[in-house]
Amino acid sequence: MSAAWRKKITNAHRNECLQVYRSLLRSCDEIQNRPLGEKLSKIVKARTRHYQNVGNAYKAEALLKDAKKQCETLKSALNGKLPEVNIESHMLSKYRKYLNEGGKQGDVGITKPHTKTKKLKSNSIFNYVRNGEVLYHLVSTTGGDTFLRPKFWPQSQRISGMLKKRITMKENKHRLIQSMSCMLRHAKLEDEFMKAYISEEDVGYADEIHKCIQMVLSDLDSIYKRESKNWHIVSQFYNMLELEAARQKLENRYLNFWKVSRRSSP
């Protein structure tokens, strides 16, 4: 795997690159052929935006190197050492995709972001059941979440950490509901206790808390309804997996019996 994510882009590197792009823009403004200058400045602005979104340090270094090279080319053209025709043929042919002209697929346009469509992986029941063994556990948390957890993970430590976080999040939500209902009960008891000592107008502590809790609980209830539906779907799917595992075991037993009987027959 590439170690590019470990190498960080320094602020000095960013500042240097942005200075190079500013000098490029100034050079574009100095070009006498205005249509060409406008096109080049448009390319430089789009290229700057592209650089600001780059997180890969090696990619950023390559962009800076390229920007310095183009800056030298433009300066030599402005000094009369290189004709403008060469700039047009070189820079526009190389960076035409930043102008978003032609609308070809895969162009890095200014308005349209460059996105690649990933192919969907075909999902089979044999990804879940193999040789009569279900490869997943059915996990239910106290928070009301249900999901399938794979028995064998290639990166077990990292993913088990993610799973623990997910379970604790659901359990914290469950504890929140319990504590809110407890708080409401205590507020009602306090109101009943205070009725004997103060007027009824001052007794509204439980009502205020009840309004706040109802707002939170309405959101949590909608989440619970979605998750109960999810529980039903996941548990049904797990039942299907168990049936498929039993079918595979029977099939293997039958095949083994058929092989043995075939060998023993004269």
Swiss-Prot record:
GO annotations of cellular component type: cytoplasm; mitochondrion
Main subcellular location: cytoplasm
Pfam families on file: Complex1_LYR
Subcellular location: Cytoplasm
Superkingdom per UniProt: Eukaryota
Keyword match Cytoplasm: yes
Keywords, in A-Z order: Cytoplasm
GO BP, one annotated term: mitochondrial gene expression
Keyword Cytoplasm (UniProt): yes
Listed name of the protein: Uncharacterized protein C2H8.04
Organism listed in the record: Schizosaccharomyces pombe (strain 972 / ATCC 24843) (Fission yeast)
Upper taxonomic lineage: Eukaryota, Fungi, Dikarya, Ascomycota, Taphrinomycotina
